Amino acid sequence: MDTPDDLYYTDDHEWLRVENGTATVGITDFAQSELGDIVFVELEPEGTKLGQDDIFGTVEAVKTVSELYMPVGGTITAINTELELSPEVVNEDPYGDGWMIEIELAAPDEAEELMGADAYAEVT
């Protein structure tokens, strides 16, 4: 499994990339491989304010639906609209083109509470 060192990770298999007070969120390579072929992604709209661990969307695979949880609190500033037409991109490139939302961080320190790559690799 691919686990980039520059990201933060959650027990629920979301990743977070922090840059200049904003963050990009998606699901991990482990999560997409466990889900199988992703056929639909539904995300909360831009402007939605959510707390840490709140649900920001769902991912539907061939045999299951999984909720997506906010790794940190914040306001959604962008959603990956490409996933509406091509949800399989999450399977193909979970850390790149398969990103899901961008957020403005409510409390940047929350990211420090998440796992680094080594800790995440131990739980997967």
From Swiss-Prot:
It holds the Pfam family GCV_H. The modification N6-lipoyllysine is found at residue 63. Its cofactor is (R)-lipoate. Coiled coil: none annotated. GO terms for biological process: glycine decarboxylation via glycine cleavage system. Gene3D superfamilies: 2.40.50.100. It comes from the Bacteria. GO terms for cellular component: cytoplasm; glycine cleavage complex. CDD domains: GCS_H (cd06848). SUPFAM superfamilies: Single hybrid motif. Binds 1 lipoyl cofactor covalently. Keywords: Lipoyl. Residues 22-104 form the Lipoyl-binding domain. The keyword Hydrolase does not apply. Belongs to the GcvH family. The glycine cleavage system catalyzes the degradation of glycine. The H protein shuttles the methylamine group of glycine from the P protein to the T protein. HAMAP family: GcvH (MF_00272). The glycine cleavage system is composed of four proteins: P, T, L and H. This is Glycine cleavage system H protein. It comes from Salinibacter ruber (strain DSM 13855 / M31).
